[in-house]
Amino acid sequence: MSSYPPRQCGLATFSSDIVNSVRLVFGDSLPIEVCALQKEENQFEYGLDVHYALTVSSIDEYRLLAEKINTRDDIGMVCIEHEFGLFEGDYGNYLLSFLLAINKPIATVFHTVLPGPNDKLKKIVKAIIDLSNKIVVLTKRSQRILISDYDCPESKLRIIPHGTHMVLWDQKDKLKNEFNYSDKTVLSTFGLISDNKNIETVLYALPEIIAKHPEVVYLVIGKTHPEVLKKEGEKYRTMLIETAKKLKIENNVFFINEFLELKQLLNYLILSDIYLFASKDPNQAVSGTFAYAMSCGCAIISTPIAHAVEALNPETGILLNEFDNSEEFQSAILKLVENKEKRLEMGRNGYAFTHETTWENIALKYAFLFAEVTESKGKLRFNFPPLKLDHIKELTTDYGILQFSKFSQPDLSSGYTLDDNARALIDMVMYYDTSSDPIALDLATIYLNFITEIQREDGRFDNYKDSNRQLTKQNELVNLEDSNGRALWSLGFLLSYQKNLPIDLVEQAQKVWDKAVVHIDGVTSPRAIAYTLKGLYYYYQVNKEMKIKTAIILLADKLLNHYHINSDDDWCWYEDYMTYANNVLPEAMLFSFLATGDLKYKKIALTTFDFLLSHYFMKGELSVISNRGWFVKGEKKSTYGEQPIEVATTIITLHLFFQVTGNEKYRNQLNLAFSWFLGNNHLNQIIYNPVNGASYDGLEDKNVNINQGAESTLCFFKAQLIMNEYKDYKKYRHLDTKNALQFEK
């Protein structure tokens, strides 16, 4: 129950974003119908989301609406978006008529919580609280006020912050050029305009700033609020325009009098250097405009509403002390106009801070709350995210794929590695086999060229090249066995698909393979052995040469020997510790069985993989080895610091073990493992970027590392390719409200 588009107000936009994000994440497994609130009957022509409309001035309609909903067995609960002024009656007490008549569970979202209530207000709000199963607020301050001033039980309360739209990082200069602001320092304010925006306070702060810095422009973005327009027309906007003229800053202040489409609005925010929030209402709890600006990477200057107090610190913006002080605004604006690096740093930090509030993450929070309120288990299913090559293409130059990104922006200074280009080659061969997309071939050619170029004369490989495409000292300081093994894996994998690939690509890979394979006898480390075994297995599928089978047996026995040396009754593993990409060891052992038919390899593969999984799957979710500290035999496993490579290799190996054994437990765990990316993790946050198809670099104890490097993105892409093979199991079922998820048939 909320105001809803085409009605133009902040709450309507908020509710539409909630509905759309839940639909995006959960599809039709969590259907939502909207009851639109309107002041007059037949006031708007609504879309298909709206099944009911409530004219808020008619108290009888509240009861009649409740009676209609009560007859619907398929409606599990009602979520009410509450704002003062939205419902009629004293402090909106007409809503109580609905709450007293409804027999469905209720979650009420308080967008504003007024402190120090009088007796009447307190009585009405307490009644809403008592008649609701759960209360949602958007800030910690609102939570404190409900507990202290309204006696709300803390157990009934849930904080779910305002959502934000995900955008790609480092688009500011590009968009400034596009909008002809390339030589400007852009200040902005947006939203439906009313005197509560207090824009005149900003205008009075600008003359001295513009005199010193004529490149400063101020964009006032948005139409006048429809309710204000009805009452007083454009009186407030006219006053602002006249004030700008009086102050002689009209050539630097631009009023964009439009209700902008979302993409255009976000573009304006991304190109803004500083966002100014000047609200004069101390009781305003939260602001969607403030949240959007921070998530778009703007440095923020704000009056001290609760949202700003909780979100801003010296690293993300400037929190003003007062609500109506032009001199304070002037000082803060000047400080950031004259310190570009500081405002860029604030923008970066704000962008990172708001990741957990992206609408996809907010959808997860609301969905889990709804499941709790309705006590429904086994009904929520994740939608399967589409494959996207965007970030892989962005990371790839004409030379190879770059190693790291700063957020979503490729970091050229990080250079290139054989490891990542080998991973990328495997991904593109897999992708081309299922899609026949010519872009995959173009990319595969780049990656194979890199592998060819970084091969030494003797057939071995270096791993590291800098941004100038020169070998680095790191190649002399670290053991390159794993990288060489990964290169052989990628070459063998490509050659196993040779029937579907251009002959020149196959011949090039064969030449590189022939030079490299002569060194496999000297491989000693378990992971290097495992990667090499994978390459040999794939090569053996199309070249049944006895020497390849002999090499597989030789290396498999080496790996088996590592197992016998390090294992005991309580530790069924190949080393006396677990580090990264652990799954590749039992995977290689199972490949050895497939190539040779020797059951001893299969037995140890099953034993060790099940041992590994026993430490990965607990309490309905996946928790892999932490990069904060390896899991040492006889010691406790570290937590957090989880990386996509470990999750993806778990998926890859579960896929193989399910194919070979047909054991349903592997498929179920496969589904559970992939749901880690989709929000089934200890933070209930997505670990992928829906905009560009990238994966984030890690899951920490309190936050997601939102850098999007090649390793993480390629691992996620390969995991998606594997999950695409399970076409009948594309959606995931939520088994309980503690996040146990699996595929829905």
Model regions: which residues?
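A short, well-ordered alpha-helix in the C-terminal region of glycosyltransferases
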Residues: 335, 342-356
